[in-house]
Amino acid sequence: MGAADVVPGVSGGTIAFISGIYEELLTSISAVNFTTLKLLKTNGIKAFWKVVNGNFLVALLLGIFTSILSLAKLISWLLEHKPILVWSFFFGLVLASILYIGKQITKWNSIAIIGLLVGAAIAYYITTLQPLISENSSPLFLFLAGAIAICAMILPGISGAFILVLLGAYKPVLDAIHNRDFKLIAILAFGAIVGLLSFSKLLKWLFNNYKNYTLVVLTGFILGSLNKIWPWKQTLTWRVNSHGIEVPFNQQSISPFSFEGDSQLALAILLSIIGFAAIILLEKIANSSSNK
């Protein structure tokens, strides 16, 4: 999940869903509220820890943050120097996740089809939005960016990292991680906690009351997000980042046969297949673990 959340266009929520921990994650997060905090005061840490599924949350968060801290530099380098190959791998991964989540939809009717199309349209529209030109690293802005992005991170198909890109916060956040600026990281994390506790309760309610339709819309989100991670892009406009380097600002998806330069088509297809197979393998591991 940490590695996925670093990539602008891939959602850690998708990985959580595929690995079979998504609903447990929502239940555990939404259990953190004023009532359980009172339980901590009256009954002690042991009772509180059990109610919020503490072992699960700590193990998951440690894995996410370890992955983000260790892979942020590598993924940034790969996105800059090998973008087609990186996007190809994640395209295959996300494509397989659509099939995986789609299999869990138990009822198809006109409302479900509309929900799928609406979810796909919303996600596609988000992928076509232009990022903000300015990069902002003020504490208040990073707090708000963390709160908004975390909502996307736990939604399968909507990338929290891409939301940071749209807000103009992606580069400041990566810089804070690279430079070990723990003050800015803490501000971002606090915003993320506030957003996470609020949004998880809504998602938990939707799963409890409208699970089938929620799955339909989430599948649509992932389907629509494929536009963002399509490997071959044409750059329409450029911008100069904070380091004085010219980088793509506005891009659109094109055919690999229309791509200027080496499309790396054969290797891209291979990596897409590997990404697709990785999800199938992850699904089998999750199923075997749940059957034990």
Predicted region positions:
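Multi-pass membrane proteins that catalyze or facilitate reactions on polyprenyl-/lipid-phosphate substrates
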Residues: M1-D5, S11-L155, S159-K292
